[in-house]
Amino acid sequence: SLRKMHALGET
């Protein structure tokens, strides 16, 4: 769940 929003933040 949170991995999805964190995915774009993991640039």
From Swiss-Prot:
GO CC terms of this entry: extracellular region
Subcellular location: Secreted, Extracellular space
An annotated Gene Ontology molecular function: aspartic-type endopeptidase activity
Keywords from the named record: Aspartyl protease, Hydrolase, Protease, Secreted
Domain of life: Eukaryota
Record flagged with keyword Hydrolase: yes
Reported tissue expression: Expressed in placenta, specifically the maternal caruncula tissue (MCT) (at protein level).
A Gene Ontology biological process term: proteolysis
Keyword Nucleus part of the UniProt annotation: no
Family statement drawn from the similarity comment of this UniProt entry: Belongs to the peptidase A1 family.
Protein name, as recorded: Pregnancy-associated glycoprotein 56D
